[in-house]
From Swiss-Prot:
GO biological process: maintenance of gastrointestinal epithelium
Keyword Cell membrane: no
Claim: Plastid is one of the keywords in the record: no
Stated name of the protein: Trefoil factor 1
């Protein structure tokens, strides 16, 4: 009986975490001074994107290959009908 309770608790926690993760998306719209470096100097745009990162070389003195940031999805509106 104890194993079933533990199993149910683990299942509930896993489902809760997965639903929270689905509520977020990532964006490459990051202020240049807030970028967290994701690559080494000289990384190409394709190498950067292969790592799952963003590439923007339009601003000097900041990382060109950087991690995207998570943004919350707006809550879905319920259909009134």
């Amino acid at each position: 009986m104890e194993h079933r309770v533990i199993y149910v608790l683990v299942l509930v926690c896993a489902l809760t975490l997965s639903s929270l993760a689905q509520g977020q998306q990532e964006t490459c719209t990051v202020a240049p001074h807030h970028r967290d470096n994701c690559g080494s100097p000289g990384i190409t745009p394709s190498q950067c994107k292969d790592k799952g990162c963003c590439f923007d070389n339009t601003v000097r003195g900041v990382p060109w290959c950087y991690y995207p940031v998570a943004v919350d999805n707006p809550p879905e509106e319920e259909c009134p009908f």
